[in-house]
């Protein structure tokens, strides 16, 4: 959220581009003027860029505020990146942390640029409503900067072309035929002038090249930030994502944003680079003549080859991206539902699915890699082949070839190579950018969450004269992209008929309370979603003020922050309203259990809160708002009856008494409290009126209500036994008693992997791990030899040409004419060794080609093998990791490894490594040749090398730290996006989209700043190393002049040609080495997960393999003195638990939140290791049983029914063990057969992400059917009916009683009606076993009332037990904070040390569970059953 120190300044300048730009208090007046000038499209919008053209600037406006210093850079600092130097200098002095990375410039911030891009996008949609183009919008967005970059780069090419064509050629000609004075002495001044000219043009080339990247980097950052921010804004404001998932959006942030950045930054090189071919062709025709057409033809042939390779790479990359999306989507589901995967022993099943996705992905990556490597391998071959064919043709045709012409031509060929190399670069980046833009455009075209018309009547808050809503948009029949393969979690076609929600006439007045009831799947929730604006309609006639409407979905959404943050939700604190919301939602006592109360951090998705606490926090958030209309979707589903009744009384009947309210409920007892009841069937409101009138006059309504009440009565629904969670809490409630600081301090060190900047140097073991993963040292040795042979053959071809030229021109013919001797040099064509040299020249060409193909193919195989093994090791470590790892590690952080890091290892790391090896070996070869030609060069090379070592060694740490900072800054960004999408409906209805967008901008700018700093630091190294090579080139040229006559022109020309080529290759080699090391951080991060995630346990132990296949046959469970402690610093979650459950016995477990109920179940599944003690199943210590055997022998039905994307069959039988008849039988027993038969594909029908195309009740029945198929002897239900209506609850209870009659059944209960018919009931308190007896013993007689109440701010749970009818009940004098009249006075409190029981005297014969409340003074004692 925006910090308190930020000053929000909204620019009010009409309907301009920047109406809602947020300025911090550090934002300069110059920046604000820039925004205004850009808004008005005046020349002033270029003022910021013009400032960088000032040669020298000394002001440092951003020195102390963390802003980017590029805004204050002068021209020299801008083009040489000297403004980065202070940061790199700090890196030399010690370890840097993330906070020292300079922030993003205001001019590059995503907020400012998103505003402009949004206007352009809206203009495009208006101009081309049917087919708007994001490509056109981005072009308009960057056109000025793009063409300016192209112009600068054009000058760079001109400078680079002038050097070899004008000055180097003349320098070599000077060496061949030096200018002499009258005394035949060489005149060096002309040669020195040529050296100076070469130095100047090379210096200008380097600076203009650096300027090109400086402009392009800022352009790329602006495009990436603007597009991602606009994407997030559109997604956050969309009605529905139309089948797209969180992982799809995160994948765009992780990969597509970077692809846009790469495409934009390389665009000037791709657009202008090929122009050098035109200049090269003209020069060669002028100098070499018509035979140069052979070389030109070679370039065009290779152009065609490169184009084919590029096209193939494009197609393969597109398919690879689709396959990657499928894998990431499945990984997101696995991580999200990891407990379900583990408890069912499905690790191998999902490993097989991921392995299959990975294989499909590798096929396309391999093809793309081959195309890319062959394109890279073609690069060095092209100028050599062109030169060989050109020179051989010239010589064999009888023409002479001078060294000056030959080596200037070779230099030009290598300059032309730049244009050739841009083709694979351009093809790759363009292909990926096109795919990225196409995918992003789909999100930008999502239908937006628009406001409804506001009703005119003052006393009416909602008015509808007839409307029909669906979950699918109007354009549901849009054409399908044939080239795009659907991801696993996409709902391609939902076979069920399109669900519609209709109501002819509906109005709600102020202060009117309306209940919505109906059977499971009838459309109750749909009505609330339609009113809140989250469904699609074609005939909307609904009028409601959405800004005055609050919607609370059944599944509570909690974001990572404090409890107070979640309740205030961006609003200012109002103590009175806040207290009423917290107190009315029964949160006061819960806050006292947290170490810092409502300032306690709740973790990702509220990880440290139970399900009931999450629901009440979400409700308090809504109650804190002062709105006119409240929409509650079964908010009491995850709460016990007592707590629900209290909240209903305090919140619904009192606090919201004068507000309009519509609430979905399954509690028939509450209907008489509502003014009206809506009865829903099949998506239609079939009855609307007062409960009593409908009950008397509407038979269907009466039948439904009677059925629900009968079920509740016959099942003995009384008081609850705890406010159990609606979803499985990642950490058991015992951990809740520890502060968020404890969680952070004691959490796995894997968390600090993201927080710590790590060591500044990549350890050698990381390289060894990569080498071993690739196949070991032998294969790498062969690969390096292939690179060396390829480079040597390349250099040898030029060396051999110099030998040929030298040999041919050194031969002489003596002519005798009397006493005169005339010595004449023969031409190269007349030399008798021409054939030999030409043949060797051609052999070098063959070796060069073969070695290039060899190293390209082998490198692709080696790098992909390494990536595959690293991925597989990490995946196996994650899926078999301990549950505690997932408790303490955010989902986005894990997905970051499988998406961004694996993309680096799959694609970018191999490319960088291949280029590094090629260029580094080439540079070493060039230096060897130069030194052999000019031994004096060593005198200069030594100090140059020292300068080089100082440059590289001093700043490698800073560059690597910047790369780590970029990695670290991604995780908060992804976590925020993921959390936002999970709570999108809440964000909409609470009008918080803008606030969450501001948080996104903050995270995105932080990430953009790190990316820009890293790229700028890399370019700093490149520029200064290029300048170092310019000095080296000048030295070689000077030696050529000074040693004229002692060194052959051919050798001198070869040395100069190699020195000039090094100007680009050397810095690229060093930069790619540093970039390679930076990209190795991805290998480091992946390897860290692979090696450091604690294991879940032995998958198959030796003892486990010897156990009979029928184990467990009886289902007997024994706990012997079992203790459980989640972390060393935490108290015992289970304390000395000993009990025995007989085979086939039905046991209910009750206790308050934090009592240890879920911990006990966790131990049976071995989700956590036992601290002390032993657990036996059928007499076998479960620690000796493999996890797969143990967990597949136990069935688990969780509270939150979730299905995986795929098919119905896969969700019922993922291991394909059962026949169709067995599956249909299970579906029939679970009352799902009719539903599945109605689907077009029956068992092969598609299931969407999370099973969202089925209702909650249907998903729960599917989970029950899955457990039924397994035929386990032990079944554990973690309150499987907590979130379903009474009808579904009844079905589930019937299935449990009939189908699992012979199995051992353990029910973790939050409703007493679900355990009162058990054989025995286990009562846990604070991790201790308080009581384990029959329901008859626990309840005694019918007149005994067992109450385990929820606690409010000064009241604790109690069990009122009447021994006779003569007890009395009095009103507590200390109950001033309670507005209920039914408060019992504790007259006598006595603690029984042996039974841990508090006795209460009450004095009323009819103590009702729903109305009595018990006060007690002990702060940590629950009132228990009196035996």
Swiss-Prot record:
It is a multi-pass membrane protein. Residues 151-432, 783-1078 form the ABC transmembrane type-1 domain. Residues 1-147, 207-268, 312-375, 421-770, 855-909, 953-1022, 1071-1427 are cytoplasmic. GO terms for biological process: cobalamin transport; transmembrane transport. It is found in: Basolateral cell membrane. InterPro entries: AAA+_ATPase, ABC1_TM_dom, ABC1_TM_sf, ABC_transporter-like_ATP-bd, ABC_transporter-like_CS, ABC_transporter_C-like, P-loop_NTPase. SUPFAM superfamilies: ABC transporter transmembrane region, P-loop containing nucleoside triphosphate hydrolases. Glycans are attached at residue 817. GO terms for cellular component: basolateral plasma membrane; membrane. Highly expressed in the intestine and pharynx. Expressed at low levels in the hypodermis and in some neurons. GO terms for molecular function: ABC-type vitamin B12 transporter activity; ATP binding; ATP hydrolysis activity; ATPase-coupled transmembrane transporter activity. Disruption phenotype: RNAi-mediated knockdown in larvae does not result in any obvious developmental defects and animals are able to reach the adult gravid stage and lay eggs. However, 80% of the eggs laid fail to hatch, and the animals that hatch do not survive beyond the L1 larval stage. RNAi-mediated knockdown in larvae results in the heme accumulation in the intestine under low heme conditions. RNAi-mediated knockdown in larvae results in an accumulation of vitamin B12 in the intestine and defective vitamin B12 transport from mother to dead embryos. Residues 1382-1418 have a biased composition (Basic and acidic residues). Residues 169-185, 290, 397-399, 792-833, 931, 1044-1049 are extracellular. Residues 1361-1427 are annotated as: Disordered. ATP binds at residues 518-525, 1151-1158. It comes from the Eukaryota. The keyword Ligase does not apply. SMART domains: AAA. Keywords: ATP-binding, Cell membrane, Glycoprotein, Membrane, Nucleotide-binding, Repeat, Transmembrane, Transmembrane helix, Transport. Pfam families: ABC_membrane (PF00664), ABC_tran (PF00005). The chain crosses the membrane at residues 148-168, 186-206, 269-289, 291-311, 376-396, 400-420, 771-791, 834-854, 910-930, 932-952, 1023-1043, 1050-1070. Belongs to the ABC transporter superfamily. ABCC family. Conjugate transporter (TC 3.A.1.208) subfamily. Heme transporter required for the export of intestinal heme to different tissues and subcellular compartments. Also, required for the export of vitamin B12 from the intestine of the mother to the embryo to support embryonic development. This is Multidrug resistance-associated protein 5. It comes from Caenorhabditis elegans. The lineage of its organism: Eukaryota, Metazoa, Ecdysozoa, Nematoda, Chromadorea. The gene is mrp-5.
């Amino acid at each position: 959220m925006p910090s308190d120190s930020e000053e929000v300044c909204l620019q009010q300048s009409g309907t301009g581009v920047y109406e809602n730009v947020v300025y911090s208090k550090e934002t300069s007046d110059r920046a604000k003027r820039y925004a205004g000038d850009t808004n008005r499209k005046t020349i002033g919008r270029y003022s910021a860029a013009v400032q960088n053209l000032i040669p020298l600037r000394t002001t440092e406006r951003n020195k102390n505020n963390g802003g980017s210093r590029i805004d204050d850079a002068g021209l020299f600092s801008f083009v040489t990146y000297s403004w980065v130097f202070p940061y790199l200098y700090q890196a030399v002095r010690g370890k840097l942390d993330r906070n020292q990375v300079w922030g993003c410039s205001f001019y590059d911030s995503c907020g400012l640029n998103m505003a402009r891009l949004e206007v352009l996008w809206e203009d495009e949609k208006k101009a081309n409503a049917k087919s708007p183009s994001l490509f056109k919008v981005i072009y308009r967005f960057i056109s000025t900067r793009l063409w300016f970059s192209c112009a600068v780069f054009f000058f760079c090419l001109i400078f680079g072309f002038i050097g070899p064509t004008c000055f180097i050629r003349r320098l070599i000609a000077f060496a061949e035929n030096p200018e002499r004075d009258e005394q035949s002495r060489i005149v060096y001044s002309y040669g020195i002038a040529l050296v100076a000219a070469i130095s100047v043009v090379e210096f200008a080339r380097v600076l203009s090249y650096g300027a090109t990247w400086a402009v392009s980097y800022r352009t790329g950052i602006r495009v990436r930030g603007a597009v991602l921010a606009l994407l997030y804004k559109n997604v956050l404001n969309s009605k529905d994502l139309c089948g797209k998932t969180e992982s799809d959006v995160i994948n765009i942030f992780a990969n597509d944003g970077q692809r846009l950045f790469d495409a934009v930054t390389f665009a000037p090189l791709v657009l202008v680079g090929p122009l050098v071919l035109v200049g090269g062709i003209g020069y060669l025709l002028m100098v070499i003549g018509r035979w140069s057409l052979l070389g030109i033809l070679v370039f065009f042939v290779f152009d065609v080859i490169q184009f084919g390779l590029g096209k193939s790479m494009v197609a393969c990359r597109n398919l690879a991206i689709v396959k990657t999306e499928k894998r990431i989507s499945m990984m997101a589901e696995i991580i999200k539902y990891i407990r379900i995967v583990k408890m069912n022993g499905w690790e191998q099943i999902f490993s097989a699915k991921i392995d299959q996705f990975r294989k499909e992905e590798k096929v396309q990556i391999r093809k793309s890699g081959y195309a890319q490597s062959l394109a890279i391998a073609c690069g060095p071959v092209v100028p050599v082949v062109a030169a060989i064919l050109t020179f051989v043709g010239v010589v064999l045709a009888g023409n002479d070839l001078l060294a000056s012409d030959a080596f200037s031509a070779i230099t030009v060929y290598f300059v032309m190579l730049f244009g050739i190399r841009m083709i694979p670069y351009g093809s790759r980046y363009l292909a990926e950018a096109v795919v990225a833009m196409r995918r992003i455009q789909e999100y930008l075209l999502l239908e937006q969450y628009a406001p409804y018309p506001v009703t005119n009547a003052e006393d009416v808050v909602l008015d509808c004269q007839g409307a029909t809503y669906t979950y699918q948009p109007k354009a549901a029949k849009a054409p399908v992209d044939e080239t795009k393969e659907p991801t696993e979690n996409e709902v391609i076609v939902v076979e069920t008929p399109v669900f519609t929600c209709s109501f002819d006439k509906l109005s709600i007045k102020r202060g009117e309370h309306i209940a919505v009831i109906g059977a499971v799947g009838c459309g109750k929730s749909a009505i609330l979603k339609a009113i809140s604006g989250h469904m699609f309609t074609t005939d909307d006639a609904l009028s409601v003020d959405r800004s005055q409407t609050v919607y609370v979905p059944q599944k509570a959404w909690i974001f990572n922050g404090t409890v107070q943050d979640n309740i205030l939700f961006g609003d200012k604190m109002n103590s009175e309203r806040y207290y009423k919301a917290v107190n009315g939602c029964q949160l006061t006592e819960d806050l006292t259990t947290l170490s810092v109360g409502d300032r306690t951090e709740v973790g990702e998705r509220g990880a440290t809160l139970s399900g009931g606490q999450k629901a009440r926090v979400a409700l308090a958030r809504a109650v804190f708002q002062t709105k006119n209309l409240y929409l509650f979707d079964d908010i009491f589903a995850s709460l016990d009856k007592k707590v629900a009744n209290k909240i209903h009384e305090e919140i619904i009947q009192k606090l919201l008494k004068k507000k309009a309210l519509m609430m979905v409920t399954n509690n028939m007892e509450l209907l008489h409290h509502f003014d009206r009841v809506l009865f829903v069937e099949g998506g239609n409101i079939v009855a609307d009126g007062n409960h009593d009138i409908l009950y008397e006059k509407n038979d269907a309504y009466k039948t439904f209500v009677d059925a629900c009440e009968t079920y509740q009565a016959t099942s003995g629904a009384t008081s609850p036994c705890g406010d159990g969670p609606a979803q499985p809490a990642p950490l058991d409630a015992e951990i809740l008693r520890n502060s968020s600081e404890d969680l952070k301090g004691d959490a796995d060190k894997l968390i600090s992997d993201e927080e710590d900047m790590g060591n500044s140097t990549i350890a050698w073991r990381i390289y060894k791990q990569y080498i071993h993963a690739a196949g070991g040292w032998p294969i790498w040795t062969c690969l390096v030899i292939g690179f060396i042979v390829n480079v040597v053959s390349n250099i040898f071809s030029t060396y051999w040409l110099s030998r040929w030229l030298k040999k041919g021109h050194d031969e002489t013919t003596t002519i005798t004419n009397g006493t005169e001797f005339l010595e004449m040099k023969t031409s190269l064509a007349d030399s008798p060794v021409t054939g030999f040299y030409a043949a060797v020249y051609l052999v070098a060409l063959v070796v060069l080609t073969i070695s290039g193909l060899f190293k390209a193919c082998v490198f692709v195989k080696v790098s992909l093998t390494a990536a595959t093994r690293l991925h597989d090791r990490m995946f196996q470590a994650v899926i078999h990791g301990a549950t505690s790892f997932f408790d303490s590690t955010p989902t986005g952080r894990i997905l970051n490894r499988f998406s961004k890091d694996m993309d680096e290892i799959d694609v970018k790391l191999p490319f960088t490594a291949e280029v590094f090896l090629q260029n580094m070996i080439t540079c070493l070869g060039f230096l060897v040749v130069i030194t052999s030609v000019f031994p004096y060069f060593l005198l200069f090379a030594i100090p140059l090398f020292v300068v080089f070592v100082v440059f590289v060694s001093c700043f490698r740490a800073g560059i690597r730290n910047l790369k780590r900072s970029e990695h670290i800054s991604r995780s908060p960004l992804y976590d925020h996006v993921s959390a936002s999408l999970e709570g999108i409906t809440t964000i909409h209805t609470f009008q918080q989209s803008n606030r969450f967008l501001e948080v996104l901008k903050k995270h995105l700018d932080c990430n953009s700043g790190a990316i820009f700093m890293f790229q700028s630091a890399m370019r700093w190294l490149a520029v200064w190393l290029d300048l170092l090579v310019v000095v080296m080139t000048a030295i070689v040229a000077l030696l050529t002049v000074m040693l004229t006559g002692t060194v052959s022109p051919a050798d001198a020309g070869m040395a100069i040609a190699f020195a000039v080529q090094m100007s680009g290759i050397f810095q690229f080699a060093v930069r790619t080495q540093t970039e390679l090391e930076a990209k190795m951080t991805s290998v480091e991060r992946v390897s860290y997960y692979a090696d450091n995630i604690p294991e879940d346990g032995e998958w198959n132990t030796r003892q486990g393999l010897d156990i009979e296949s029928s184990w467990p046959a009886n289902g007997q469970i024994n706990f012997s003195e079992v203790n459980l402690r989640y972390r060393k610093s935490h108290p015992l979650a289970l304390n000395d638990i000993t009990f025995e459950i007989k085979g086939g016995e039905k046991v209910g477990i009750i206790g308050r939140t934090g009592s240890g109920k879920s911990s006990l179940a966790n131990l049976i599944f071995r989700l956590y290791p036992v601290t002390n003690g032993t657990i036996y199943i059928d007499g076998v210590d479960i620690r000796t049983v493999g996890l797969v055997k143990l967990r597949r022998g136990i069935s688990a039905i969780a509270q939150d029914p979730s299905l995986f994307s795929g098919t119905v069959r896969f969700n019922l039988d993922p291991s394909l063990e059962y026949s169709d008849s067995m599956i249909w039988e299970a579906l029939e027993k679970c009352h799902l057969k009719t539903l599945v038969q109605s689907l077009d594909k029956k068992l092969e029908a598609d299931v969407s992400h999370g099973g969202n195309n089925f209702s909650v009740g249907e998903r729960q029945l599917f989970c029950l059917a899955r457990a039924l198929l397994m035929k386990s002897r032990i079944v554990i239900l973690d309150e499987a009916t907590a979130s379903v209506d009474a009808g579904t609850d009844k079905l589930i209870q019937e299935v449990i009683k009939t189908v699992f009659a012979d199995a051992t059944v353990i029910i973790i209960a939050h409703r007493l009606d679900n355990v009162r018919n058990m054989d025995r009931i286990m009562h846990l308190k604070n991790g201790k076993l308080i009581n384990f007896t029959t329901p008859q013993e626990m309840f005694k007689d019918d007149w005994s009332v067992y109450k385990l109440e929820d606690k409010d701010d000064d009241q604790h749970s109690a069990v009122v037990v009447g021994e006779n009818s003569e007890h009395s009940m009095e009103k507590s004098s200390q109950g001033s904070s309670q507005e209920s009249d039914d408060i019992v006075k504790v007259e006598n409190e006595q603690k029984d040390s042996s039974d841990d029981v508090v006795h209460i005297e009450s004095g009323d014969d009819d103590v009702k569970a729903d109305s009595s409340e018990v006060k007690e003074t002990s702060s940590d004692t629950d009132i228990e059953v009196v035996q």
